[in-house]
Amino acid sequence: QASIRALVDNDFIVICAGGGGIPVTESGQGVEAVIDKDFASEKLAEVLEAEELIILTGVSKIALNYGKDNEQWLDQVNLTELEQYIQEGHFAPGSMLPKVQAAMDFVQVSKNNVAIITSLEDLADFDHETGTRIISD
């Protein structure tokens, strides 16, 4: 934590908390597990008391009805709206759903927190209008 904090405090852009990793348990016995990169990133941002979390994916924004004729890209969405969209099944498990859930967890930490889901390509021209902004209610 101290190393990452030092980089952030010196204006470095820190890219870390990728997937994989080794699961650790208190029992001392091996377990099968996956360290989810989205939730790991959210937890790191929370510990560092960040106000903004950017989660990268393969598309510019999150969408309702993804891949269908009535696909709708979202510029900004709040927590209540996202809960509804999750209940309606708009986000694929193991794909966009964990990204959305991690973003929601981060925004719930503080009403001032903002999460952005976007693509690496769009991040190159990042102007805080890129991607989907997830905000508090």
Task: Enumerate the language-model features and the residues they cover.
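C-terminal catalytic "cap/lid" subdomain
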Residues: Q1-D137
